[in-house]
């Protein structure tokens, strides 16, 4: 396994560890999710380029579209929670349930 793949897997693992450790603030959770999606995008792109599998060349673009939608929803939720409660704690999301 090449050094590039190891670095990308390490970036994914660090983002996952950050997501599991720093769960108190919504902004840090969203940043860790974006790091995970970015490393998945780069890994998928490299694998498709190395295997010369042209039929799956749209898969990284679709992944990037879903990452953008996730970021937009996450930021809108962050703005709503911070305007309502004044903080961005994840524990405030439990108060949104009916």
UniProtKB/Swiss-Prot annotation:
Q: Name one GO molecular function term.
A: NADH dehydrogenase (ubiquinone) activity
Name the chemical reaction catalysed here: a ubiquinone + NADH + 5 H(+)(in) = a ubiquinol + NAD(+) + 4 H(+)(out)
Record's subunit section: Core subunit of respiratory chain NADH dehydrogenase (Complex I) which is composed of 45 different subunits.
Origin organism is: Pantholops hodgsonii (Chiru)
Q: Which domain of life is it from?
A: Eukaryota
Where does the sequence pass through the membrane? 1-21, 29-49, 61-81
An example GO CC term for this entry is:
respiratory chain complex I
Alphabetical keyword list: Electron transport, Membrane, Mitochondrion, Mitochondrion inner membrane, NAD, Respiratory chain, Translocase, Transmembrane, Transmembrane helix, Transport, Ubiquinone
Q: Family membership, please give it.
A: Belongs to the complex I subunit 4L family.
Its chief place of residence is: mitochondrion
Gene Ontology annotations of biological process type: ATP synthesis coupled electron transport
Q: Where in the cell is it found?
A: Mitochondrion inner membrane
Annotated InterPro entries: NADH_UbQ_OxRdtase_chain4L/K, NUOK/Mnh_C1-like
EC number(s)?
7.1.1.2
- Protein name (record): NADH-ubiquinone oxidoreductase chain 4L
Pfam families to which the protein is assigned, alphabetical: Oxidored_q2
Please give the function described in this protein's UniProt entry: Core subunit of the mitochondrial membrane respiratory chain NADH dehydrogenase (Complex I) which catalyzes electron transfer from NADH through the respiratory chain, using ubiquinone as an electron acceptor. Part of the enzyme membrane arm which is embedded in the lipid bilayer and involved in proton translocation.
What membrane topology does this protein have? Multi-pass membrane protein
């Amino acid at each position: 396994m090449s050094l590039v793949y190891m670095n990308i897997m390490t970036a994914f693992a660090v983002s996952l560890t950050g997501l599991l450790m720093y769960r108190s603030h919504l902004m840090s959770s969203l940043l860790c999710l974006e790091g995970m999606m970015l490393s998945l995008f780069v890994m998928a792109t490299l694998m498709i380029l190395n295997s010369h599998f042209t039929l799956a060349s749209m898969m990284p673009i679709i992944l990037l579209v879903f990452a953008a939608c996730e970021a937009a929803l996450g930021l809108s939720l962050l703005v709503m929670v911070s305007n309502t409660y004044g903080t961005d704690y994840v524990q405030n999301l439990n108060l949104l349930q009916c």
